[in-house]
Amino acid sequence: MASGKEIKGKIGSIKNTQKITSAMEMVAASKMKKAQDRMTASRPYAENIRNVIGHLANANLEYRHPYLEDREVKRVGYIVISTDRGLCGGLNTNEFKKVTKDAKKWQEQGVEVDFAALGSKSCAFFNRFGGNMLAAESGLGDAPSVKDVIGLVRIMLNAFNEGKIDRLYLVFNKFVNTMAQEPLIDQLLPLPKSEDKALKHRWDYIYEPDPKPILDTLLVRYIESQVYQGVVENAASEQAARMVAMKAATDNAGDLIDDLQLIYNKARQAAITQEISEIVSGAAAV
């Protein structure tokens, strides 16, 4: 059994760690609220433009933009959004499992796979996993903006425009609530059509003066908005997962301290009993 001094040292060390995890839990809770506010503010725009684009994909347009046309899939691309830091439970691990499983399905069909990584964790993972890395970006911070994602998005759009990839997906963790975050794979290109059940009525469009420049701009803005929404959703998910993980770590540290304190008390009791026994034995010998 460890000595009382060693046990006391362990208890002190765990208490110090507990203070750190408790502080990290409070910081994550504060950051989660701000991230939720950004996510909530951007959701209406992202959802509305998604609805408009879904109607566009179903409409009989006078000009069919290349982003609306399905083509034979020879190569797919994934924009994978992850965190820059760890200590957020299985958030990144679950996401990477989902995207690698999906990528392997394509590879089994003879389709090549490209990646664009947003976040240092995804950069590191896909460098190990393999696959062609077209772009990588990290260090977006706690308050990302659309400008931060434009460069990476344009690289993937150029690859699609040049026929280097035939389908583009966005991978991120959707914020459901504080206790639940869901890894999602959304198809960005070709633009997915709205399901007939979701169409209460079909819209028609009149473009002035010319549909081509309007669609060229609108569809690029749509892709940028969806990637940005993925970034803010992932940021809220990160802080929620970190808050939960740090709370669990703090609670576990408390349980461990209680267990060690019990061991220390037993060791101290045994030592006192031993001393009393030795004193009694010595007195009896005299």
UniProtKB/Swiss-Prot annotation:
Gene Ontology CC, one term: plasma membrane
Compartments where located: Cell inner membrane
Keywords: ATP synthesis, Cell inner membrane, Cell membrane, CF(1), Hydrogen ion transport, Ion transport, Membrane, Transport
Primary residence: membrane
PROSITE patterns given in the database record: ATPASE_GAMMA (PS00153)
Coiled-coil blocks: none
GO biological process terms, semicolon-separated: proton motive force-driven plasma membrane ATP synthesis
InterPro entries: ATP_synth_F1_ATPase_gsu, ATP_synth_F1_gsu, ATP_synth_F1_gsu_CS
Membrane topology term: Peripheral membrane protein
GO terms for MF: ATP binding; proton-transporting ATP synthase activity, rotational mechanism
Residue pairs linked by disulfide bridges in the UniProt entry: none
NCBIfam families cross-referenced by the UniProt entry: ATPsyn_F1gamma, PRK05621.1-1
Family: Belongs to the ATPase gamma chain family.
Function of the protein: Produces ATP from ADP in the presence of a proton gradient across the membrane. The gamma chain is believed to be important in regulating ATPase activity and the flow of protons through the CF(0) complex.
Oligomer status and interactors: F-type ATPases have 2 components, CF(1) - the catalytic core - and CF(0) - the membrane proton channel. CF(1) has five subunits: alpha(3), beta(3), gamma(1), delta(1), epsilon(1). CF(0) has three main subunits: a, b and c.
Protein name: ATP synthase gamma chain
